[in-house]
Structure formats: structure tokens, C-alpha cells
Curated annotation (Swiss-Prot):
Family, per entry: Belongs to the tyrosinase family. Hemocyanin subfamily.
Organism listed in the record: Necora puber (Velvet swimming crab)
Gene Ontology CC: extracellular space
Role: Does not function as a hemocyanin.
Subunit structure: Hexamer.
The protein's name: Pseudohemocyanin
Tissue: Hemolymph.
Length: 12
């Protein structure tokens, strides 16, 4: 998944 701090989409 994406690393925290690099939002690809709005992941809440």
C-alpha cells in the first residue's frame, strides 16, 4: 500500500 504522508487518493 501507500506509505503514510503520500496520499494518492483520500485514504482516511
Amino acid at each position: 500500500d501507500e506509505p503514510d504522508g503520500v496520499p494518492t487518493t483520500q485514504k482516511q
